[in-house]
C-alpha cells in the first residue's frame, strides 16, 4: 500500500448500516484465529472490563444485563432498551470501531502506519473515545490495551448520563423509547437558540431541565432536552413547530449540557481510567475536538480523557469547526499525492467533510480506506488462538442401535428406508407374561409391553479385551458395548494411540452418559460375585476403556437423565476447549433389562401405552423406550487436519443449561431451551438463520413437542427477521424410528446428524401417524420451517458450509445443544505415487477374527476394485491398532493383493500354523556388508522418498566433503554411471549408506540389539554402536582407501569366494602337485562352507582352476585389492597412526567382533591396533555369530537385518543357521521401496511392529484414510437372565414392613396336607388360573424319613422323587379346584431342574423350611412350580429357587399312542439284554448285589429297594421291580415307589463297568418329562428299561429314557433323564452334613450352578390376545394375572443358567473334566481351579498365555489364591500372578515350590 501524504482517521458516533449482529459475529469468529491475536486480546480485555463494570452496578441494573461470554454477543439482544441502553450502545460502538481497526491491520498484515506528522484523528461524540485510544498508542498492541479502557469510560459515561437523566424525567411507563434530541434543518443556530431561550424564559423551567442546542453546523441544529420539554418547546414556537425536524435515536439522556454537569461529574466518569492507564502516557497523535475544531491540548492520557469527558458532558458539537480543523490539516500536507480518509463505512457527516476537501483542494488526490470491509474476508484455514477458540472435529463413530443397526451404515439404511423398530420386550430381558399389566393394578408391573432393542446384547469378545468369561458375564452389557463401540469408533478414526501428539495416551479422555444400572441392580445382583463392583458400577464403564487402551486422560460417567449421551459429548468438548485433553471418546449407553424402570416410567406417565414415539402427532402419548450404544471420537479441528483424519462434521459450540423456571422438575421450559440455543450460537458467532437442520429431542409427548417446537421456531425461524424461501429449516426426530434411547438418545441423535452430513440427505420423518399436533405453531410453513416428510436432499452449497443443531433434553430439566457444521472441504494432494510396492498388514487377537477380517477385506476389495493401494496400505498399516495374530504381504497392486488373500484363505494350513506373536519381541542384529555390494544408485528410491534418510545422507556427505573427500550423493542416488569408481568413493558411499540405513531403521521404530560388520562394514557398525563417531568412521574409511590407492597396486592381488570350508580348501590345494606350492591367505570365514581366500592374481587364478576341477564353486570378487592379505601390509602402520588419536568408547549396542570371535561390551577391546588387525587378519564371521549364540544375545527368533547395498551378510547368516530370519535393506536390481516393504512386513509378522506412521509420513497428506470394514469380533453370549418374579414379589413388603415370622407350628388346619406338603400360606383361585404357595418343613418326621431313605456320603439327600410327589400333589389339588368335575387328572411332570441339593440338617429339633410356589393356567393346561429355601428365623424366602418344573395336564390317550409305537422296540431291547445274560455277555445282578453296587454313591433304605433283579450291559439295563406294599405316609405317589421304578438309570451310571466309578460319581439334575398312565400299585410288579448315552453337545453329561412296563405294556416313562459326571473328590464338598445355618447361607448363595444346562421356559400365565402395533403387524401380548385383595405370588419362571462359584451344595459342579491327565499333580489341580473360576477352558491355559490376556486381574488373583488355599491347601500370595505373568512361569513356580 502506497503511503499517503496525509490522512484523517474518522471515528463516527453511529454504527455502520451493516447487519450489526453479523459484524460482531464476524469479529468474534476472527478473534479466535492466531492471525488476529491483538484483536482477541482487545475483545477479551473489553469483555472483562464490561463484566467488571456491570458487577459494580446496583443489583436491579445487573439483572438487566444478559450473561455474556464475550462482548460480541451483546448485540444479539436489543441492547438499546432499558436504563442501560446508552451505556451498552456507547461501549459497543467503541468496541466495534477499535476492534475493526485492530482487525484491519492484522488482516492485511501491515505495520502500524499512523504517523503523527501526517495523521490527524477526528470524530463525534462517543466516537472520540475510540479516537482517544488510538491517539495514546504508538503501536497496535497499545490500541488493544488502551482501547479496553476507552470501552470502560464509554460504558461509565452512558450509565452516568442515563442515571442523571432519569432524575430529570422518568421513562415512559409502557417502556416505549422517547428521543432526547431532535435535529432541525433550515434554521440557523442563532435562530434556533433564540426560540429556545424564549421558551425557557416564558415557561420558567428550572435551568437543569431547559431545552438547549447540543450541536450545530451550517445546515442543521440539534435540539436537546427532556422529551416532554422538547415536545413543549416545539409546540410553543411556531418556527420550530413548522420547521423540518426529526427525532434522533438518543433515548437515554443528555450529553453536551454545560448547565447540567460540572467538573465533579466529569471526574466521577473519567476517574476509572486513571487506575489502568498511566496518567503520564503521552498523547502521540492529534485528536480534533468537536467543539473547537482544534486538537485537544492535552499532553498526557489523564489530561486527554478529562478534556474529552468535559467536551462530551458539557461541550457543544460544531461540525463546521471539525471540518475546518481537518481542512487545516490537509492544507499543511504536501500538495501532491493522495490524501487518505480512514473510516468505518460512510456517513452523512463524513460525506460533508469529503465534499469540503474536494471543494477546497480540487487538485489533491483522494483515497479512502474502509476499516470494516476486511471483516467479510476469508483468511484461509483458521489457526485457533487458544484451545477455547478451536473448532472440534468428529472423526469416528460407532453404534449398536435397535433394528439391527449395529454400525452407522446399517443405521443409515434404517433411516433412509423409514423403518420403525418397535417390538415387544424380548424374553431375554424379562417375561411379559408375568410383568405386564395394562390395567396398572399389578404393582411393579409395566403398563406397556413395547420397546426398541438391540440385537444380541450379551455377545462380547472377552478374550480381545483381556477379560475372563466370568468377568465378562458379570460386566454390564452397556460397559462391554462401550468398549466395543469405542474401539470401532477409534478404528473408523484411524486412531492409533501415540501415533501423533494429539493421540498420546495421557491426553485421551472418555466421557459416557449412563442413566440406569439395570444389569447391576437386576441381572448381576442375583449372584453378587468378585466382579460385582467393577462390572456394574457406572464409573467403570469409562474406567474400563481408559484402562484397556491405557488412556490416562479424564474419565467421566455422566447422568443427566435422557440427555446423558449428548451431555457427555458436551463435557468432552469442554475438556478439549479447556485443554484437559487432546482427543476424547464420548457416547451414551442404555441396555434395558429391569422391569422396575418400566414400571417407574409408566407410573410417572412418561411412556406411551400404544407404541412408538409419535413426534409431533396429535395422538402423541409418551415415549417408547429403547436400547442404544453410541461412541464418537472428537479432537480439535487443527489436530484432525494435521493427523490426516476423515472429518465427519465439525462442532462449533455445545452447551448445557437447566430449566429452572419450569412448572415442574420434569416439565420442559421453552425459555431455557431458547437461552441454550442462543448461548451455543453466540459461542460460535453464528446467525441462527444460517442453521438449516435441527435434530429435535422429539420424544413424542404433548408437553415436550409443544415446548420444543416453540423454542426451535422462535430462535431458528423467528417471525422477524423471517427466513427466505431458499433458507428453509428442516427438522427431524430419530426417536420416531428407533424410540427413546434415554441415556443414549442424545448420542443417537448426534449420529443421525453426522450421517445426514455424510449422505447429504435428511431422512423422512415417520412420527406423524395421524395428523400434525395442533399444539405446534400454525405459521411454521410461513416461516419456512418444518419436518422432512420425505427423504429430502440436503446438498452442500458450493464454497459454503451447512449448519445443523442437535438437541437433547433430560427429564430432570437439563437441556443440551450441539451446533455442527460441515467438515472443511479437503483437496487431496494429487502426485505420482512412486511407491510401486506397498505393505499390507491385517491383525486380530484370535485366528477366527483374523480369518474373518481377511474375508471382510477381500469382500470390500471385490466391491471396490478401483481402491488406491497406497490408501489401503496407509490405512491398514499406519491407521490401525495391531494385534497378536497377524497376516502381512507386500503387494504391487490390488489384483495381486486379492490373489494373495484368497490363497491364504484357501490354504487350511495357513490358519492352522498361525501363531500369535511372542510376548517378548525378538532381538534384532544389524549386519553391515563390506564394499563388495557396491553399485551406483544403491539408495535412489529411499533418498527420493524419505526426508529423514535424505537428511542423514546429506549430513554425512557434507561431513565427508569437509574432510576433503568427494561427494557420495551421486553414487547413492545413481546420478553417475554404474561403472568403476575409485576405492575412496566406493568405500565412503557404502559407509554413508549403511550408517544412514541403520539410523533409518531406528527411525522406523526398530530397536537394535547388536551389530556386526563384515570387513569395511565394521566401520559403519562401530559408528552406529557409538564406539566411534560417524565423522571418525568416515575419516578412517576415506583415509584408509586413499592409503590403499597410494601404496597398493590395483589388480596385483585378488580375492576368491570358495564354496568350501577352510580345511577342505587346504586339503585340495596341498594334495595337488600343481598347487601345493601356491601361496594364499584365508580372508574371510563367512560360513562353515563358505570361505574367501586372497593372494596374488597368479596364485588365485591357479587355485581357482584346481578347485573348479574338483567341482567346487568359486567366484572371483570384483574388488581392486585383496583385503585381509599381505597386500595390506604397506598401509597398516599409517592406518594405526591415523586411528591412535581417536577415543574409542564402550559400545552402546553390543558389537559382534569377527576379528576377536567374541561379543564386545567394553571400551578396551576396540582400538587403533584392532583396526590394524581387522584390515590384515581374517574376518571370522562364523566365530562372531557363534559367540553371540553362546552368550544368549541371539537365538532362533532373532531377526537379522542386512544393512548394505545388497543382502550379502544375510546370505552368510543363513549359511550359518538355515532357519535364521533375515531381511534386507536394499537389493541390487530391486526398487528400494519394494525391498523395504517386504522387510517391514517380515518384521511386523515377527512381532517387531515398525513405526508405520514414520514410514508413511513423507506422503501422509497424499493418502486417504479408507473406511474399511470393522474388526470381526470372536463373540460369545455372556448373559445372566433375570429369573423369577422378585421385582414383583417385593411389592408385598410395603414401606419396609417385615414379613411376619414364619410359623412352623402347623396348628392351623390346611385344606391340603400330606407327608411333604404341610401348610398352604397363599391360595388364589380365579376363573382360569390358580396360585398356591405351600410351606413345608424338611425336618417333619415323614419328610425327614424320605430324605434319609436316600443317603449320600452319610447324609440324607432329597431325591427327585420327593419333588415329583409334591408336584403331583399340588397339581391335582389345584386342577380340581378349577375343574371340580374332573374324574382323572393325568399329569406330565416336565422340565424338572434341580439346581441345589437339599441335605438334611443333622441337628435334632431344628427347623428346615422350604416354600413351593405354583401357578396353574387352564388356558395353557400347565402349571409352573418352583421350590425355595426359607429362613427359619424370619420366614424370608430365598430370592432364587433351587428347583423348578412345569406340570402339564395332558390326554393319556396321546401317551398310549406314542408308547404303542415304541413298545416293540423296547421289548426287543429287553429281550436282547436277557439273551446276553444267558450268553454270559451281560451281568445279571441280584437285589443285594445291585444295591451293594448302588452304595458306591447312594445308600437306599429298604422301602426304596424295589429292584429284584437287574441285567446290566455297559450303559443299558433292564430290571424286575416289586413295589413295597406299604405307603409309609400320605402321598400322591410315594417317593420310594417312584424311585424303585426309575432309579435303574442311576445304577447304570454308577454301577456299570462302562463308567469310571473310581474317580467319578454321577448325579441327576433332572429330566424332561415324567408320566404315569395309571397310579402305581402297592406291591405291584413292573419292569424298568433304560439305555444311557453321552450328550455330544454337553461335556460330561449323559441322558436316557427310563421305560416303565407292566407286563408287555408301557405304563410310564421318565424322559430324557440326565446324569452329570462329577469328580469323586468333590463328594465331601457337595454332600456333607448340613449345619443349622445352612438354610440361611443358601439364601445368600442362590445362584444356580448346573453349568451348561439349558433351562426350559414355563407356559405363559395367560392366553395371549392380539394388540395392534403397526398396520398389519399384530403382536401377541399376554394378559396379566388379575389382582385380588390378597396379593397372589406371580407365576414362576425357571432359574438362571449362571453357574455359582461352588460354595453352596449343588447337584452339578461348575467344572469341566478333561480326563485323568489333568488330575495329576498340583499343577493340574491348579489349572482346573483357574479354569473353573474364570470360566475358561483348561485348553486355553497354555504356557505362553499371559494372565492379562486371560483376564485374570488383581481381583481374580485374590480369588484364585484363596481357592488354592481352601481347596488345595496351597498358600500363595496373589502377587505371584504379577511375578509370574504367564501360565508357563506360574506352573514352573508351582512345580518348584509346591
Swiss-Prot record:
Annotated region (Product template (PT) domain), positions in chain: 1314-1633
Polar residues: bias regions: 1644-1655
Disordered, as annotated region: 428-448, 1637-1719
Keyword field contains Acyltransferase: yes
Pathway connected to this protein: Secondary metabolite biosynthesis
Essential cofactor(s): pantetheine 4'-phosphate
Gene3D superfamilies: 3.30.70.3290, 3.40.47.10, ACP-like, Malonyl-Coenzyme A Acyl Carrier Protein, domain 2, Polyketide synthase dehydratase
UniProt keyword list: Acyltransferase, Multifunctional enzyme, Phosphopantetheine, Phosphoprotein, Transferase
N-terminal acylcarrier protein transacylase domain (SAT): annotated segments: 19-256
Domain of life according to the entry: Eukaryota
BP GO terms, sorted: fatty acid biosynthetic process; secondary metabolic process; secondary metabolite biosynthetic process
Family annotation (Pfam families): Acyl_transf_1, CurL-like_PKS_C, ketoacyl-synt, Ketoacyl-synt_C, PP-binding, SAT
E.C. no: 2.3.1.-
Enzymatic class: transferase
C-terminal hotdog fold as annotated region, ranges: 1482-1628
Database matches in SMART domains: PKS_AT, PKS_KS, PKS_PP
Region (N-terminal hotdog fold) residue spans: 1318-1454
Record domain Carrier: where: 1717-1794
Ranges of biased composition (kind: Basic and acidic residues): 428-440
Domain Ketosynthase family 3 (KS3): 389-822
Region listing for Malonyl-CoA:ACP transacylase (MAT) domain, in residue ranges: 927-1230
Notes on the domains: Multidomain protein; including a starter unit:ACP transacylase (SAT) that selects the starter unit; a ketosynthase (KS) that catalyzes repeated decarboxylative condensation to elongate the polyketide backbone; a malonyl-CoA:ACP transacylase (MAT) that selects and transfers the extender unit malonyl-CoA; a product template (PT) domain that controls the immediate cyclization regioselectivity of the reactive polyketide backbone; and an acyl-carrier protein (ACP) that serves as the tether of the growing and completed polyketide via its phosphopantetheinyl arm.
Protein purpose: Non-reducing polyketide synthase; part of the gene cluster that mediates the biosynthesis of neosartoricin, a prenylated anthracenone that exhibits T-cell antiproliferative activity, suggestive of a physiological role as an immunosuppressive agent. The non-reducing polyketide synthase nscA probably synthesizes and cyclizes the decaketide backbone. The hydrolase nscB then mediates the product release through hydrolysis followed by spontaneous decarboxylation. The prenyltransferase nscD catalyzes the addition of the dimethylallyl group to the aromatic C5.
Protein name per UniProt: Non-reducing polyketide synthase nscA
Species in which this protein is naturally found: Aspergillus fumigatus (strain ATCC MYA-4609 / CBS 101355 / FGSC A1100 / Af293) (Neosartorya fumigata)
